């Protein structure tokens, strides 16, 4: 559905992305209490929920983003309101419906996760500035991330980023080449982490 609506990506890779999001996203097991003792006494570190999180979704990775964010955010005791990208609204809404149905069947309250039904830049901005929102998580282009970071609220921004690959003398060069090409072409390179190789490689 995401490939059809957005016109981007590769179906087989999107299936794998969803599976990885379901199986590898940290859940409640990640949130443990730690005690640190030293010369100055004992410190107890315990994570606490923010409350309601506004999650701004991208068009490049809409379904896996909803799955990933739902798991880690509700595991932390939060509720989530998703703001779909206009180019991926149908698949984002459908994913939220499916995940909320599963949560409801597991005993979660209605509305633990939801999505904006009216999708627009104004609606997204209204969500981010709502007094009911305690944290913003924005995945998208520089403009969206900038808006989240300048909202005056705690925000996590994930914009485009292309990390370099360092292939040094300890590498299996043939395998490194295969892995670099596979990673850079995965889902037609939509995940904003495509690699490039510096010509000044030490190999």
Where does each model-flagged region fall?
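N-terminal Rossmann-like NAD(P)+-binding subdomain of aldehyde/semialdehyde dehydrogenases
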Residues: 1-43
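Conserved small-residue-rich beta-alpha loop and adjacent elements
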Residues: 28-101, 106, 142, 151-155, ...
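A structured beta-alpha segment of the ubiquitous adenosine-cofactor-binding alpha/beta core
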Residues: 31-45, 113-133
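ALDH superfamily catalytic-core signature
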Residues: 75, 145-203
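General beta-strand structural signal in soluble alpha/beta enzymes
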Residues: 82, 115-117, 137-140, 155-158, ...
């Amino acid at each position: 559905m995401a490939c059809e609506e957005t016109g981007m990506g590769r179906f087989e890779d999107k299936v794998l992305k969803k599976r990885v999001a379901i199986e590898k996203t940290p859940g409640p097991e990640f949130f443990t209490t730690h005690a640190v003792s030293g010369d100055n006494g004992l410190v107890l570190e315990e994570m606490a929920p923010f409350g309601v999180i506004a999650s701004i979704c991208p068009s490049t990775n809409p379904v896996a983003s909803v799955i990933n964010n739902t798991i880690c955010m509700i595991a932390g005791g939060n509720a989530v309101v998703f703001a779909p990208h206009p180019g991926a609204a149908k698949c984002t809404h459908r994913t939220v419906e499916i995940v909320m149905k599963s949560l409801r069947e597991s005993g979660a309250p209605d509305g633990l996760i939801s999505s904006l039904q009216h999708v627009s830049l104004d609606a997204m901005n209204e969500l981010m500035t709502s007094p009911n929102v305690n944290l913003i998580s924005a995945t998208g282009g520089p403009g969206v991330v900038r808006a989240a970071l300048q909202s005056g609220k705690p925000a996590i921004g994930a914009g485009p980023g292309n990390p370099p690959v360092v292939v040094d003398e300890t590498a299996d060069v043939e395998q490194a080449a295969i892995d670099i090409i596979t990673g850079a072409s995965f889902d037609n390179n939509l995940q904003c982490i495509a690699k490039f190789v510096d010509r000044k490689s030490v190999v």
